[in-house]
Amino acid sequence: MIIMGLDPGIAACGYGIIHAKGTKLECLACGVLRTYSDESATKRLESIYQGVSNLISEFSPNTVAVESLFFAKNSKTAMKVGQAKGVLMLAAAHNNLEIFEYTPLQVKQGVCGYGSASKEQVQKMVKQILSLDKIPKPDDAADALAVSLCHSQAYRLRTRL
């Protein structure tokens, strides 16, 4: 199964694509889709949509996992991230992909085994689980891989029951 994990953001939207076959996990790609503040909001959202659509075409994921928006001190920022998340979900829906959402707590539990894990602990586990040479950069890419791993774990548990 190929899982595309997404960490929504308007300036940097992280993606992490893994291949999960049984207990074997392999990182196929990770990175960020960047937009720039001098672009209009519409152009930025279109860029995110196109970028995710291109990744879907290239990697043909079976499913998409998205990190849920938890909270933001700035409501304007929360709104922009929510718009980016909507565009990501639309791209997945246009490709008939099932979408799963995970909270940051669920991602930490799925990757590290406990919900109070630090960002650094999650990144180290992503590196270890996927047998990577180094922690993926930027953080948004590592976060997206963590979302993919969380879904892989949740899927394995669901299919065993």
Curated annotation (Swiss-Prot):
Q: Main subcellular localization, coarse class?
A: cytoplasm
Query: Coiled-coil stretches, from where to where?
Result: none
Domain of life (superkingdom): Bacteria
Q: Name one GO biological process term.
A: DNA recombination
Q: What Enzyme Commission number(s) does the record list for this chain?
A: 3.1.21.10
Name the active site residues. Answer: 7, 67, 140
Which keywords belong to this entry?
Answer: Cytoplasm, DNA damage, DNA recombination, DNA repair, DNA-binding, Endonuclease, Hydrolase, Magnesium, Metal-binding, Nuclease
Keyword Zinc-finger assigned? no
A cellular component term from Gene Ontology for this protein is:
cytoplasm
Known catalysed reaction(s)?
Answer: Endonucleolytic cleavage at a junction such as a reciprocal single-stranded crossover between two homologous DNA duplexes (Holliday junction)
Cofactor details (free text): Binds 2 Mg(2+) ion per subunit.
Identify the residues that bind Mg(2+) 2.
Answer: 67
- Keyword Hydrolase: yes or no? yes
> Where found?
Cytoplasm
Enzyme class, spelled out: hydrolase
Q: Tell me the residue numbers annotated for binding Mg(2+) 1.
A: 7, 140
Tell me its cofactors. Answer: Mg(2+)
Assembly information from the UniProt record: Homodimer which binds Holliday junction (HJ) DNA. The HJ becomes 2-fold symmetrical on binding to RuvC with unstacked arms; it has a different conformation from HJ DNA in complex with RuvA. In the full resolvosome a probable DNA-RuvA(4)-RuvB(12)-RuvC(2) complex forms which resolves the HJ.
| Protein family according to the UniProt entry | Belongs to the RuvC family.
* Annotated function: The RuvA-RuvB-RuvC complex processes Holliday junction (HJ) DNA during genetic recombination and DNA repair. Endonuclease that resolves HJ intermediates. Cleaves cruciform DNA by making single-stranded nicks across the HJ at symmetrical positions within the homologous arms, yielding a 5'-phosphate and a 3'-hydroxyl group; requires a central core of homology in the junction. The consensus cleavage sequence is 5'-(A/T)TT(C/G)-3'. Cleavage occurs on the 3'-side of the TT dinucleotide at the point of strand exchange.
Instruction: Name the chain's protein.
Output: Crossover junction endodeoxyribonuclease RuvC
Organism encoding this protein: Natranaerobius thermophilus (strain ATCC BAA-1301 / DSM 18059 / JW/NM-WN-LF)
Mind giving the lineage of the organism this protein is from? Bacteria, Bacillati, Bacillota, Clostridia, Natranaerobiales
Instruction: From the UniProt record, report the name of the gene that encodes this protein.
Output: ruvC
